[in-house]
Amino acid sequence: MHTLQYIAVEADNKQQAFDKVVVSLSTREDGYRFADWSDWHVVGGGRFSEKAHKNIMDGYTDDPTDILGFAEDKDKFQETLVQIGKWKAQAMNRAIVEFKPDKFISDMVDYASEGGRSEYSGDVMMSAYTMKEAATMLMGGWTCDSGLYDLEENIAEATYIKERLDKPEQAVRQYLVPVDFHF
């Protein structure tokens, strides 16, 4: 599956913003991947980019074209932050519907009484996964449903970028870099 995420970064220009994101998402020599929930990505929006809408093969190349700079288009930048907030609300509402607290507690009791898991159950795993993803989002952690990651503050929330937008000297240096993540 693919998900569009925006990486919020402070930079002097689009190219520098692009480069910061490319470097931060690169796998380190020790195998560490910053976006550990994703197996690969395309910086610049990938299949969600304007270029890919014209030619799907352009969706597999890193490209800085679709990066949003606050100084260049304040309205589109703000609209994107609003849209990200809607994505987050949709993800949390899905979790509310999918999460079954009684089932989760029952699974925990079974686990404790058995001294661990005696067999794999997809039903048990999905209940736990829903809980884990919702809790991760509530704590500002980055998931496939976060929609945004603030590289400057290391949190998957828009709180700090919104604060930076309130300071004119910082606002002009704010960028949202679209990234197509596969997971």
Regions found by a protein language model. Give the residues of each.
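Short, extreme N-terminal segment that most often corresponds to the first beta-strand
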Residues: 1-39, 172-183
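Low-complexity, serine/threonine/proline-enriched polar segments
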Residues: 23, 28-146
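Well-ordered, non-membrane alpha-helical segments in soluble/globular domains
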Residues: 18, 80, 85-89, 102, ...
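Conserved aromatic
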Residues: 9-11, 71, 128, 152
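Acidic, proline/glycine-rich low-complexity IDRs
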Residues: 1, 132-133, 137-183
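Short beta-strand element of the conserved SAM-dependent methyltransferase core
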Residues: 6-11, 97-98, 148-149
